[in-house]
Amino acid sequence: MGSSQSVEIPGGGTEGYHVLRVQENSPGHRAGLEPFFDFIVSINGSRLNKDNDTLKDLLKANVEKPVKMLIYSSKTLELRETSVTPSNLWGGQGLLGVSIRFCSFDGANENVWHVLEVESNSPAALAGLRPHSDYIIGADTVMNESEDLFSLIETHEAKPLKLYVYNTDTDNCREVIITPNSAWGGEGSLGCGIGYGYLHRIPTRPFEEGKKISLPGQMAGTPITPLKDGFTEVQLSSVNPPSLSPPGTTGIEQSLTGLSISSTPPAVSSVLSTGVPTVPLLPPQVNQSLTSVPPMNPATTLPGLMPLPAGLPNLPNLNLNLPAPHIMPGVGLPELVNPGLPPLPSMPPRNLPGIAPLPLPSEFLPSFPLVPESSSAASSGELLSSLPPTSNAPSDPATTTAKADAASSLTVDVTPPTAKAPTTVEDRVGDSTPVSEKPVSAAVDANASESP
């Protein structure tokens, strides 16, 4: 509860008459005065900011006459105006039937003492104090400090003490007569725990919201209006409604006729026809039927889907390393093919005189460099021209034949045979070395005859 006021009091000040107790059926009760929270600040426009007989005189002057009373509520922190009629005929004591005390309402809610645990057979239990819901708000004397209550209890040892107690459960104040006794058999003179401070103040508006709540049990003859969201119509029991035909159920059943999930789905249609429009629940037998559904082709029953083949045959293990014509192999490089050169035939190994035959494996053939297309016009004669001059060569025909034979074999291994190769070799050899014309020609002819 806040201790500061939110409105300005007419005439200024923070003083008034604190309403402590309101008797039943009294003029103050009919005016709506609320104990502990209400402060009478003025009557008929007269500000009550002093502790004198002004309030009594105004009430006596207006007996059986309605007067206007301005009330400040520390619960709502607002001012309100009410009408009260002082009377001696209502059947109780006083003209208003209320107990009041002049004090300041600024900080009045801070001086409260919260009743905590209450021991059995203690003076507090015998006086009717209720644990955790009772708040001691005052006594016959003014208490402004926390020690004022304990001092008052010590001075009333074994003597009756009147306390004003507010209860949050009943939202009302009452007078409690308690007799402090330190020899009651327990701790303390009251036998109860008392809290003081910020954490033990009276909660703000404890029952204002709760009073507006009306339970359905209090209105036995009033039928409960169903909600418009449809949730009140959902029945959680297994008993079906007597006869309900919601319009949305028929459309759902018609739209589901074209959807063939299994051969006979009777369980689904029975659930949709129960009449429950919002929460259709599937019974357990649906799951049993779904477990026995044979494999089917969804393209035959569901429209708008791409048709799938009826079944896939058992495929053997495929060799994933087979290169497709449109897929470049991921590992390795493709073979370099020169479009201007025909493929080279495999040559048999040469048996040279005096040298052991050297086998030429086929796996070493791709390691030889290929002659580019620009040098394809070069003949074997150019390769022979790089040999040493024939003037320095020995005159032995067999040696000349062997060299020519070796040169001819080198030329055949590197460059493909062409039609112009023999003529070019004969012309170049004839121009440079006329002495070895016949042996070279014979060697070339021999090679040509030996080639496959």
Swiss-Prot record:
Summarize the impact of residue 449 to A: Loss of phosphorylation. Does not inhibit ER stress-mediated disruption of homodimerization
Task: Give the residue numbers of the N-myristoyl glycine lipid attachment.
Answer: 2
Top-level taxon of origin:
Eukaryota
Q: Which residues carry this modification: Phosphothreonine?
A: 222, 225, 415, 433
Compositionally biased region (Low complexity): 372-424
Pfam families in the cross-refs: GRASP55_65
Q: Which positions does the record annotate as the modified residue Phosphoserine?
A: 214, 409, 436, 441, 449, 451
Q: Does the keyword Disulfide bond apply?
A: no
Which family does the entry's similarity section mention?
A: Belongs to the GORASP family.
Assembly and oligomerization: Homodimer. Homooligomer. ER stress induces phosphorylation-dependent monomerization. Interacts with BLZF1/Golgin 45. Identified in a complex with RAB2 and GORASP2. Interacts with JAM2 and JAM3. Interacts with members of the p24 cargo receptors. Interacts with CNIH1 and the cytoplasmic domain of transmembrane TGFA, prior its transit in the trans-Golgi. Interacts with KCTD5. Interacts with TMED2 and TMED3. Interacts with SEC16A in response to ER stress. Interacts (via PDZ GRASP-type 1 domain) with core-glycosylated CFTR in response to ER stress.
Q: What is this protein identified as?
A: Golgi reassembly-stacking protein 2
Question: Which lineage is the organism of this entry classified under, starting from the top rank?
Answer: Eukaryota, Metazoa, Chordata, Craniata, Vertebrata
